[in-house]
Each structure stands twice: as structure tokens, then as C-alpha cells.
A protein has these predicted regions:
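N-terminal entry segment of metal-dependent catalytic domains or homologous docking segments
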Residues: 1-73, 148, 195-197
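Short Gly/Pro-enriched turn/cap motifs at secondary-structure boundaries
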Residues: 15-18, 115-118, 248-251
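Catalytic core of PPM/PP2C metal-dependent serine/threonine phosphatase domains
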Residues: 25, 79-155, 181-201
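Short hydrophobic beta-strand that contains or immediately precedes a catalytic carboxylate
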Residues: 38-40, 143-145, 207-209
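Helix-loop-helix
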Residues: 57, 61-100, 225-246
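Short, surface-exposed, charged loop/turn segments at secondary-structure junctions
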Residues: 145, 156-169, 220-231
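Conserved, helical-rich catalytic subdomain that frames metal- and/or nucleotide-binding sites
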Residues: 159-206, 315
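C-terminal catalytic subdomain
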Residues: 189-321
Length: 321
């Protein structure tokens, strides 16, 4: 009998800072043995040009939607599929998205903006592909270009699966330094779609998020705190989704989009029980100490980040055997 994907539920939100002007997008799709979820952040600085052919929308707005549609269609047309993540990136996801962008390049009828940072139809991409593996395990493959992220959340804590394509590599430093994006989807420059694959035993949660979700806290552990606090104060998945969005919106200075999927739990209450101890751990070890620091005490925050970092970076800084 074929082992089916133990999906509990999918949550998503896509919130605009300026109503009806948001440049984020997302997608998700599932079959019996695989699932894909992703977020896409149209780059409003590099893609600020507006065009009549886009009904006055920016290239960033259009790019994120073209790219999310390309990933969605790629999954629907090609899965189930056992191809390695690297080949999926090179032969399916990347060329399909680039073709969509190229086919929809605008006529130059809009306001012309020039400069070395300007791109045609620029957007980030961060997608997670979850597939069944042997022995009841699940294979999680992250695909990304830019600074949107894929995470895994389990009782060990939150962990980043993607490495930001910016000039500042450290997640803590990235909150304080304005790193330059080095690699994004666009129709006029070379793009690299990175991959990272891990094999995990359920239960766990996979989430994809644009930088508006995690980029306006003072430390990475505060983002985990938002996820867990909002979970433990919810009665059902839909309320968790609402709680997360409301907490993120309190500090977000950008559009914020998330798509999340839970795997292998025996109901919503089981998720809360599984992760409640982790919340107590980070509340006592990291969150309460962070909240007690003066706003300007970056050194104190850095010290706490140094203790938290190893678990958070456990998949990006795996030690060789």
C-alpha cells in the first residue's frame, strides 16, 4: 500500500502594507505523496516601474504573481515525481518561471527608471517541496532565490533551511544591516535557484515566509516566539493563522506573506502539546531576557543570539561526519 503524505492542514495569509498595492504572492498544492508551498516577494525598489499593460501595477507586483503561478503549475503538471531537488530546480521550476517572466516582459510604455539595481520583473522565491521517504520519513526540499525563507518548526525549535542571497549572511546581522540582494528572479539577468534537502521524521511544521514576517523583530528568536505564542493562544488552525498575522502586523513595515503546512500530528491540540515545552524554554532562556534589555542594547541581544544560534542554524551548518 502506498504511503500517503500525513498532511494535517495548510495555513496562509498575504497582507498588504498599502491596501491593494501589495507585491507579495504565494501558492500551494498537494497530491497523495507530495506537496509544495511557496512565497514570492516582488522587489518594489528594483521593480518599481509601472505599465499600462499591467493595469498600472508595478513590475514587482506582476513578477511575484507570475512566479507563484509558474511554481504552482510546475507542481500540478509534474508530480508525483522522484527527481532529485537539484534537477527539479534546473529542469522544471527555474525554466518554467523564467519563461513566464520572459513571455510577459512589458512594453516600455511606463515611467522609465534606470540604474544598476533596476531589474525587469524582479521577485524573490522561497518554496518547500515535501515528499514521502522510506520508513515513514519525509523529505523536505527548499528552493530559493533572494531573501524569502523556508523554515522547519518542531519540538527542537525553529530552523532556517534557506540562506539569504544578500551581502549579509548572518540572520541576526541581517536585522540591523541593509544587505543588498544578490540573486533574485527577473527576466533580464542570470538567476540561480538554490536547493537544500533534509529528511525528517514527523511530526513537524514547514513554513515559507517573505521578509515582512521575520524582518521587523530585534532577534530571530522573537519570530519563533510569535509562531509559538500565537499557536498556544488559538483554539483551531484558522485562529492560529489570524493570531500570527495580527502579531506580525504589529511591527511589520512591509507586505507580509506566509504559507505553512503541518505534518504528522494527531490533531491541533497535539501540535500545541508537542510545542508547549519549547515555548516555555525559549520564553525563559531568550524571550524574557530580550524583552528586559534596553532598546539600544544590541550587545546583549547578540549574546543571546549566540546561545540560540546553533539550533536555529542546525540544517545550514551541519557538521561533516
Amino acid at each position: 500500500m502506498q504511503y500517503k503524505l500525513p498532511l494535517n492542514f495548510v495555513l496562509s495569509f498575504c497582507k498588504d502594507v498599502i491596501p491593494d498595492q501589495g507585491e507579495d504572492s504565494y501558492c500551494y498544492s498537494f497530491c497523495d505523496t507530495a506537496g509544495m508551498l511557496g512565497v514570492f516577494d516582488g522587489c518594489g525598489g528594483a521593480g518599481a516601474k509601472k505599465h499600462d499593460c499591467y493595469s498600472g501595477k508595478t513590475e514587482a507586483y506582476i513578477a511575484s504573481r507570475l512566479c507563484s503561478g509558474a511554481f504552482y503549475d510546475s507542481f500540478r503538471r509534474n508530480f508525483p515525481n522522484n527527481m532529485p531537488a537539484e534537477k527539479l530546480a534546473e529542469e522544471i521550476f527555474l525554466p518554467t518561471a523564467l519563461q513566464r517572466l520572459k513571455e510577459n516582459e512589458p512594453d516600455q510604455d511606463g515611467i522609465r527608471i534606470t540604474g544598476s539595481m533596476v531589474r525587469t520583473l524582479p521577485t524573490t522565491a522561497a518554496a518547500a517541496l515535501v515528499r514521502k521517504a522510506k520508513g515513514g520519513m519525509l523529505e523536505v526540499s527548499a528552493f530559493w532565490a533572494g531573501d524569502s525563507r523556508v523554515y522547519v518548526l518542531d519540538k527542537t525549535g525553529l530552523a532556517q533551511l534557506t540562506q539569504d542571497d544578500t551581502s549579509v549572511a548572518d540572520p541576526m546581522e541581517n536585522l540591523y544591516e541593509d544587505g543588498v540582494l544578490k540573486n533574485i528572479f527577473c527576466s533580464d539577468r542570470k538567476v540561480t535557484l538554490h536547493t537544500k534537502t533534509v529528511t525528517l521524521k514527523p511530526p513537524f511544521i514547514v513554513l515559507t515566509a517573505t521578509d515582512g514576517c521575520f524582518g521587523y523583530v530585534s532577534t530571530p528568536m522573537e519570530f519563533e516566539g510569535i509562531l509559538l505564542h500565537s499557536l498556544l493562544n488559538a483554539d483551531n488552525p484558522k485562529q492560529w493563522e489570524q493570531n500570527m498575522q495580527e502579531m506580525i502586523a504589529l511591527s511589520a513595515g512591509d507586505d507580509h506573506t506566509m504559507c505553512l503546512a503541518a505534518f504528522g500530528y494527531r490533531g491541533f491540540v497535539a501540535i500545541q502539546r508537542n510545542l508547549s515545552k519549547r515555548y516555555e524554554e525559549i520564553l525563559n532562556a531568550y524571550l524574557n531576557p530580550v524583552y528586559a534589555l534596553a532598546q539600544e542594547d544590541r550587545e546583549g541581544r547578540q549574546a543571546l543570539w549566540g546561545k540560540y544560534r546553533s539550533d536555529y542554524m542546525r540544517y545550514l551548518e551541519e557538521k561533516s561526519e
